[in-house]
Amino acid sequence: MEIKTKAMGLVEIQDEQIIELVDGFYGFEEFHKYALLDSGKEPFFWVQSLDDQNLAFIVIDPFLFRPDYELDIDDELLKPIEAESPKDLLVFALVTIPPAGSPITANLQGPLIINKKNKKAFQAVLNDGKWNTKHDILAELNAAGRN
């Protein structure tokens, strides 16, 4: 299947790349179907809306720069995506790329959680106070000795 994307024009995708956000992203609740695309620039991925080519998010695996990242998610929140085990889950942090000179940040307070088995997903909100919406990715990589 071909889709139009914001960043890469026309792209061929496979069914396995399609995810369904059961409630949409916060602020974009009306959009539910997305494709998870390789950005071509590791370690980032695109989450591209299938309904609006101008709606796309950059995401990253938060464990790459915060190996101590922990999610305390209530089992009730996992029911809509039918997750049976933590092993079934993929976790991504949404990335913000600001104007030049400002750090690239990741939202660790509102991660994207995907059930690998059925491709259902949701955006969680972590309220433990440890994580915030603007973690400096480069500073965190340097602190973790991974850059």
UniProtKB/Swiss-Prot annotation:
Acts as an anti-CsrA protein, binds CsrA and prevents it from repressing translation of its target genes, one of which is flagellin. Binds to flagellin and participates in the assembly of the flagellum. NCBIfam families: PRK13285.2-3. Pfam families: FliW. InterPro entries: Flagellar_assembly_factor_FliW, Flagellar_assmbl_FliW_dom_sf. Keywords: Bacterial flagellum biogenesis, Chaperone, Cytoplasm, Translation regulation. Belongs to the FliW family. Its main location: cytoplasm. It comes from Treponema denticola (strain ATCC 35405 / DSM 14222 / CIP 103919 / JCM 8153 / KCTC 15104). It comes from the Bacteria. This is Flagellar assembly factor FliW.
